[in-house]
Amino acid sequence: RVINDDCPNLIGNRDLYKKVEWICEDCSNIFRNTGMATLCRKNCFFNEDFLWCVYATERTEEMSQLRQWVGILGAGRE
């Protein structure tokens, strides 16, 4: 079960969420810092820690796709 109150469009988009969240999990594993995943997911992935994790996990070639997915998940966010 996936719960993230920061992402208003999580329902119906769990597959996208899992793809984006995987970057946060990888980042947390790379740096052995469990709090990193939480920081990465903050504000539905719309934060500097998420971008930092994209670079740290060497996923920059996917940046435009990731931005699109984060936009979908966070649509309607205040």
Swiss-Prot record:
One of its GO terms (cellular component) is extracellular region. One of its GO terms (molecular function) is neuropeptide hormone activity. This is Molt-inhibiting hormone. It is found in: Secreted. It comes from Cancer pagurus. Pfam families: Crust_neurohorm. Keywords: Disulfide bond, Hormone, Neuropeptide, Secreted. Disulfide bonds join 7-44, 24-40, 27-53. Inhibits Y-organs where molting hormone (ecdysteroid) is secreted. A molting cycle is initiated when MIH secretion diminishes or stops. Also has significant hyperglycemic hormone (CHH) activity.
